[in-house]
């Protein structure tokens, strides 16, 4: 789930 946060970068 946390990976979704960096996927934006």
Curated annotation (Swiss-Prot):
Keywords of the record: Amidation, Neuropeptide, Secreted
Function of the protein: Myoactive.
Compartment annotation: Secreted
Family: Belongs to the FARP (FMRFamide related peptide) family.
Organism: Panagrellus redivivus
Main location (coarse class): secreted
Modified residues (Phenylalanine amide): 9
GO cellular component: extracellular region
Any single biological process term in GO: neuropeptide signaling pathway
Protein name: FMRFamide-like neuropeptide PF5
């Amino acid at each position: 789930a946390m990976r979704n946060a960096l996927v934006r970068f």
